[in-house]
């Protein structure tokens, strides 16, 4: 049985109908990640594209079968660290996973993510990088490519788009000496599945699968 055939046997952890933009490959990525990580998982999805498509839920309704927390944009990793410590204290092994965009990871949440990485908090932190604050009108982020047009870095009247280089987020996290750092893409689902399985096997610190350039 190949990886795709094996993935097809996993239970889908999110409903078929969510309000993501048509053709959104972040939705495909989220579905794949939730399938592989399975029902014994607690997710934190901060404000962003995936937090607003029905994953988190409103009015006691959610598109997800697993518990999903809705943290602030800047405290995702530290909140998950506390949740993981609680489950370790009661002797229960649970996957504790962040699914956060580049705004919550590369910018607003970098401080607490850096702290979690340095402490060796046993969480899985998945960053989906769509290179901007997409669900609020496409403002530039620290992950936006140099020269790119966004609503806050226009290409008009002598302004040539974003002036700063894109932050090398995978390298920044690797320099924290995390036990596992990987880049992956929904264009290569078998590779993504294998890397998620490796992240789940890490038990001595933070695992960082980074989904690049969505």
Over which residues does each language-model region extend?
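Cofactor-binding active-site loop characterized by glycine-rich and histidine/acidic residues
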Residues: 2-125, 138, 143-149, 162, ...
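Glycine-rich ThDP/TPP pyrophosphate-binding loop and its adjacent helix/strand module
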Residues: 92-96, 107-123, 128, 132-214
């Amino acid at each position: 049985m190949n990886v795709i055939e094996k993935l097809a046997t996993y239970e889908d952890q999110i409903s078929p109908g969510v309000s993501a933009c048509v053709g959104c490959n972040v939705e495909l990525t989220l579905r794949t990640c939730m399938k592989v990580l399975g029902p014994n998982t607690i997710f934190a999805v901060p404000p962003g594209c995936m937090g607003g498509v029905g994953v988190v839920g409103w009015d006691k309704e959610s598109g997800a079968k697993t518990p999903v927390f809705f943290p602030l944009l800047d405290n995702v990793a530290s909140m998950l660290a506390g949740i993981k410590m609680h489950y370790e204290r009661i002797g229960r092994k649970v996957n504790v996973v962040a699914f956060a965009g580049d705004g919550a990871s590369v910018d607003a949440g970098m401080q607490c993510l850096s702290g979690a990485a340095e402490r060796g908090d046993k969480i899985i932190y998945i960053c989906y990088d769509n290179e901007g604050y997409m669900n609020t009108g496409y403002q530039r982020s620290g992950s936006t490519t140099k020269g790119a047009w966004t609503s806050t870095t226009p290409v008009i009247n002598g302004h040539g788009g974003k002036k700063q280089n894109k932050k090398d987020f995978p390298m920044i996290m690797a320099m924290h000496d995390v036990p596992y750092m990987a880049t992956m893409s929904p264009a290569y689902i078998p590779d993504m599945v294998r890397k998620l399985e490796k992240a789940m096997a890490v038990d001595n610190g933070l695992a960082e699968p980074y989904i690049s350039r969505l």
